[in-house]
Amino acid sequence: MHRTFLFSKIHHCTLTETNLEYVGSISIDQTLLDAAGIVPYEQVQVVNMNNGERLVTYAIPAPADSGAVELNGAAARLGTRGDRVIIMTYAQLTSEEIEGFEPRVVLVDQENRVIEDAPVVNASTPELCLT
């Protein structure tokens, strides 16, 4: 039996742009994709912290170190520049894979740069809440 678990998360990104006329997806700075282990065209869930909207789309790379996080296509209607979002991927794990598994959590600053010295957030630190 497989169970679905959070695989990776980019926490508190800031939307830098929306592009209604683009075919679809969310463009994400390649540096953030690499840090989170997200590959191009992988399914992602995006949660908008400003308006509560949730959507499922796929990730495409934006230039590395650009800080770009852009909602494209119809998804552009669900956010505006400056909104804070959480980007998540999930994985199907077997019972054997579950033990010891921890998702990859990437914390970013307001310019969507990885916070290198951020504390590790996992099940053993539920009291940690970043603003």
Curated annotation (Swiss-Prot):
The modification Pyruvic acid (Ser) is found at S25. One of its GO terms (molecular function) is aspartate 1-decarboxylase activity. The keyword Ribosomal protein does not apply. Its main location: cytoplasm. It is found in: Cytoplasm. Keywords: Autocatalytic cleavage, Cytoplasm, Decarboxylase, Lyase, Pantothenate biosynthesis, Pyruvate, Schiff base, Zymogen. It holds the Pfam family Asp_decarbox. GO terms for biological process: alanine biosynthetic process; pantothenate biosynthetic process. GO terms for cellular component: cytosol. It catalyses: L-aspartate + H(+) = beta-alanine + CO2. It is an enzyme of class 4 (lyase). Catalyzes the pyruvoyl-dependent decarboxylation of aspartate to produce beta-alanine. Heterooctamer of four alpha and four beta subunits. Belongs to the PanD family. This is Aspartate 1-decarboxylase. It comes from Acaryochloris marina (strain MBIC 11017).
